[in-house]
Amino acid sequence: AHQFLSAQLADHTLARTYECIVTGNLREDSGTVDAPIARDSRDRKRMAVVPGGRRAVTHWEVIARYPGYTHVRCRLETGRTHQIRVHMAYLGHPILGDTVYGAKKAVPGLTGQCLHAVGLQFIHPRTKALVSLSCPLPEEFTAMLRKIDR
């Protein structure tokens, strides 16, 4: 079962979907970031877009735009450490509340960054049926959407 699921991860048939709120407004309605990621040479706790790093691909689309913020859906083609956080910051739109790759100060009323896994889809190892799992946005995330919509 583990091998079967690992193979889906490797051949990009396992689908992982996230939602996030980024700072600023993305100009395009959708796009793909295909930029390699590796450890940041200046700070080993961080990851960064680095030539020669491991291939990392994030597909994104705008859900809604607000003054100074954008609600985004991301689909991972690869799965690198902090991939969405690194790629959104690379685009110049770090995730709201991300003090590692974005703002240096915490956002009042937010305990972490506005990034949430909303969906996972894979083929079941034994039954070969398509399994779709979803998880609603947490209250803290939806409260932040209400706050920025004012």
Language-model segments: what does each one mean?
Residues 1-150:
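RNA pseudouridine synthases
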